[in-house]
């Protein structure tokens, strides 16, 4: 018998400057409210996180400090508390910083939001704890050719079956960001999870299936209205690091050849981080309600290949 338990608690307040991508049920409720006509919005949900402004009246912020002109304020973002328990085999989908974990794990994420003129700072770190108990993974008794087929996946993706063999207890930046905002535009540095695409569980590109990463972003805060319709976009550049964990049985051989191929760059260097750039543009024609057309492009390369070419990397 397998038991899977997932809890999500709100302490104090529930909304932040951007609605956290990991709050999937909030997005689901928003989608349903839009379909039922309870909320009117031009957001397509193709680019997440989205700004909370269009439901601001429903937000439960607690203002800690504010001046008379409202160009300076500090607000509490409350505490998000995720709990997950698997009795037998891990479930690891749409849960951000959490890992494939048998047993108990949690994420605690307090937050505070500061606004000073065009500058906004959101500090919302995530503390993750997981017992990481051993579990039965890919069966050792499979025929070698089955292992060879499995390694076709593992050799082309950083998707460890298990994240080490000790418990996890660490704090990361989580859903934090520093931005400069002007009208409907925003530029800044962020560590937030990103979701590109109109899907519900599996995005077209980028998602919360894994922990977030550091990036620079230039994006629209809300749809830009024009004579022919609405436009949304996000352009990012960032840094992707390896998980640091290998798949199981890296010593396994098939037909006299080791199945495990270490991930190395074109110069033979292992564990090199990757530089990435990507963008998404979404267009909603004025004449057709509910239709959105999008374009997504993503480029990444190993850092050693561009070393010395860009001094700011």
Predicted features by range, described:
Residues 103-108, 169-176, 181, 209-216, ...:
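Residues that define the transmembrane beta-barrel architecture of outer-membrane proteins
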Residues 67-70, 114-118, 181-184, 223-233, ...:
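Short loop/turn motifs that connect adjacent beta-strands in outer-membrane beta-barrel proteins
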Residues 14-104, 109, 113-120, 125, ...:
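N-terminal periplasmic/intermembrane-space "pro-region" immediately following the signal or transit peptide
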Residues 1-21:
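Bacterial Sec-dependent N-terminal signal peptides
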Residues 110-114, 176-182, 189, 216-222, ...:
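Residues on the lipid-exposed face of transmembrane beta-strands in outer-membrane beta-barrel proteins
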Residues 159, 163, 194-195, 210-313:
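Signature for the C-terminal beta-barrel architecture of outer-membrane proteins
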């Amino acid at each position: 018998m397998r038991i899977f338990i997932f809890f999500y608690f709100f302490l104090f307040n529930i909304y932040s400057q951007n609605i956290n991508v990991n709050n999937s049920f909030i997005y689901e409720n928003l989608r349903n409210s839009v379909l039922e006509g309870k909320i009117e919005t031009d957001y397509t949900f193709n680019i997440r996180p989205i700004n909370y402004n269009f439901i601001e009246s429903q937000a439960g912020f607690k203002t800690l400090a504010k001046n008379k002109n409202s160009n300076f304020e500090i607000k509490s973002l409350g505490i998000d508390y995720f709990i997950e328990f698997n009795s037998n085999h891990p479930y690891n989908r749409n849960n951000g910083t959490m890992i494939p974990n048998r047993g108990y794990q949690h994420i605690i994420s307090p937050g505070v939001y500061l606004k000073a003129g065009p500058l906004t700072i959101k500090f919302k770190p995530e503390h993750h704890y997981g017992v990481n108990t051993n579990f039965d993974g890919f069966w050792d008794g499979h025929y070698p050719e089955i292992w060879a087929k499995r390694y076709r996946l593992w050799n082309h993706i950083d998707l460890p079956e298990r994240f080490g063999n000790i418990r996890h207890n660490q704090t990361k930046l989580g859903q934090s960001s520093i931005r400069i905002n002007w009208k409907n535009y925003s530029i800044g540095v962020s560590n937030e999870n990103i979701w590109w695409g109109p899907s519900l569980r599996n995005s077209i590109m980028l998602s919360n299936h894994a922990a977030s990463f550091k990036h620079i972003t230039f994006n629209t805060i809300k749809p830009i209205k024009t004579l022919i319709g609405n436009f949304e976009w996000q352009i990012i550049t960032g840094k992707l690091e390896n998980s640091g964990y290998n798949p199981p049985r890296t010593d396994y051989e098939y037909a006299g050849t080791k199945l495990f191929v270490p991930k190395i760059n074109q110069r033979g260097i292992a564990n090199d981080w990757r530089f990435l750039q990507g963008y998404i543009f979404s267009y909603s024609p004025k004449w057709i309600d509910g239709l959105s057309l999008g374009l997504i492009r993503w480029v990444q390369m190993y850092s050693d290949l561009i070393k010395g070419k860009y001094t700011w990397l």
